[in-house]
Amino acid sequence: MDKTTIIVVDDSPFASKQIKDLVEENGYEVIGYAKSGEEGIKMYEELHLDIVILDIIMPGIDGIETAEILEKSDPDVTILMLSSLCDTGTLEEVRAIGVKYLIPKPWEDDVLLATLELLKKHKEENKKEDNN
């Protein structure tokens, strides 16, 4: 089976490297980083990969607006959001745009990996349904 491909959209190079190291040790492939929402949108449109790991707080357009743009351009996009803002209002805002998973920063490695596994399985199930 092909590796699940991921881009990390986070303005923190340190966080991006931590995520890359963790997920690649566990069978995923990080094929790019973006430091802003604008870069992340462009990268996704060029590569159409499996999962976008997206921070909320970034310069320029934030993660919520980035997710809205990605969802409008590709309703099948799979997004995992990370943020130090995990209050009820933020969670409701994230869900309203169709993102199902928001993990608090700093994240627990096992939670991040378990969530990626759920997203991967969900994406595989959708592909099977589309092929039937």
Roles of regions detected by a PLM:
Residues 13-32:
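Two-component/phosphorelay signaling modules centered on CheY-like receiver
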Residues 47-53:
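Active-site beta3 strand of CheY-like receiver
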Residues 58:
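Receiver (REC) domain active-site loop signature in two-component systems and cognate sites
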